[in-house]
From Swiss-Prot:
Keywords noted in UniProt: DNA-directed RNA polymerase, Nucleotidyltransferase, Transcription, Transferase
Role, per record: Promotes RNA polymerase assembly. Latches the N- and C-terminal regions of the beta' subunit thereby facilitating its interaction with the beta and alpha subunits.
Transcription as UniProt keyword: yes
UniProt keyword Ribosomal protein present: no
EC number, UniProt record: 2.7.7.6
Lineage of producing organism: Bacteria, Bacillati, Cyanobacteriota, Cyanophyceae, Synechococcales
GO biological process: DNA-templated transcription
Subunit and interaction comment: In cyanobacteria the RNAP catalytic core is composed of 2 alpha, 1 beta, 1 beta', 1 gamma and 1 omega subunit. When a sigma factor is associated with the core the holoenzyme is formed, which can initiate transcription.
Cellular compartments per GO CC: DNA-directed RNA polymerase complex
Name of this protein: DNA-directed RNA polymerase subunit omega
HAMAP family reported for this sequence: RNApol_bact_RpoZ
Enzyme's top EC category: transferase
Record field: catalytic activity: RNA(n) + a ribonucleoside 5'-triphosphate = RNA(n+1) + diphosphate
Family: Belongs to the RNA polymerase subunit omega family.
Length: 75
């Protein structure tokens, strides 16, 4: 899912897809920011492995995967 050598074009496509498929661009941006903040604190707490992927990049990838593959979500 998350590669150490992140492709910037792929990341841009994922971000555009999130925005394009949302009904509210502002709320999507807030979701990305909130998820990035959570990941940043998880990194501080040592819950996540060391990664060269920045929290915002990780958030975009995770939200994009959740949008594209909803059957992976629990519940």
């Amino acid at each position: 899912m998350i590669r150490s050598a992140l492709d910037s074009k792929d990341l841009a496509k994922r971000g555009e897809s999130l925005i394009r498929q949302s009904s509210n661009r502002y709320l999507t941006t807030v979701r990305i920011a909130f998820r990035a903040k959570q990941r940043r604190f998880d990194d501080f707490d040592g819950l996540l492995e060391e990664s060269s992927v920045k929290p915002v990049q990780r958030a975009i990838i995770e939200l994009s995967d959740e949008q594209d593959q909803p059957d992976l979500l629990p519940g």
